[in-house]
A protein has these predicted regions:
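Active-site loop of classical SDR/Rossmann-like NAD(P)-dependent oxidoreductases
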Residues: 173-175
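Conserved amphipathic alpha-helical segments that form helical-bundle/coiled-coil interaction surfaces
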Residues: 91, 97, 104-166, 177-187, ...
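Short linear motifs at protein or domain termini
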Residues: 1-100, 104, 213-226
Length: 226
């Protein structure tokens, strides 16, 4: 696992520090989906006692990133087909609200900057960079939708989906995916709510289907890892 992520925690609020470090490891795939979280191992890796690790795991359970069972203990959420369908159903509804708000008052300079970045990555593909850009894209849209509750809910759903998307990235068409983002941006800049919703739906459905395809071809993803 990454030496940087598991660098010793020295900030006073150890529980929050450990929480952020474990969350980062989960979100970036350093701790794979389905992995069991051992308090002993994590406390050794972070060079802290088991108490802040235990508290951090409880906080991760509250976010939905980690499941806690009596028999197996704590483990990272598994990207099952049912999880994927349910989460994308919720996310689509929330993203529709986001683009509706943005069409009413589009942050033009920010959207044009995002557009240029996606245009650039379509010509020079980098999977890791693209994943970061996609997260930043949806985060930027939600933050400028002028609804803090919407932003909070999208962040929560997006964090869970981020675990799954590491598996889907190889199934996403490179150029077409960048064009999907550009099409959404153009619709918002034109204040065309109907088209913005349509393009957002297409984008989310394509990402969802890429993940579902991977899960169907790799059922071992849903096998818990001890």
């Amino acid at each position: 696992m990454s030496d940087t992520i598991f660098a010793p925690a020295s900030i006073p609020n150890l529980r929050e520090v450990v929480f952020e470090k474990i969350r980062e490891a989960i979100m970036t795939g350093v701790i794979p989906a389905g992995s069991k979280l051992s308090e002993i191992d994590l406390s050794r890796q972070f060079d802290v006692s088991r108490t802040p690790v235990r508290e951090a795991i409880r906080q991760l359970v509250e976010t939905g990133l980690v499941h806690l069972t009596t028999r197996r203990g704590a483990y990272v959420l598994l990207p099952t087909a049912k999880d994927t369908l349910d989460l994308y159903e919720i996310r689509t509804a929330l993203e529709f609200i986001s683009v509706e708000h943005l069409c009413a008052n589009p942050p033009r300079d920010i959207l044009l900057q995002l557009r240029g970045e996606f245009d650039e990555v379509s010509n020079d593909w980098d999977a890791n960079r693209f994943m970061t850009m996609d997260v930043d894209f949806h985060t930027t849209l939600s933050k400028h939708a002028n609804n803090s509750y919407l932003d909070f809910m999208l962040e929560r759903v997006g964090a869970i989906l981020q675990i799954c998307r590491h598996y889907a990235i190889g199934n996403i068409p490179k150029v077409s995916s960048s064009r999907e983002h550009i099409a959404i941006i153009d619709a918002i800049l034109s204040r065309d709510v109907g088209r913005a919703r349509e393009k957002m739906r297409e984008h989310l459905e394509n990402t969802r289907d890429a993940l579902l395809e991977y899960i169907s071809r790799h059922p071992e993803v849903a096998i818990p890892k001890e």
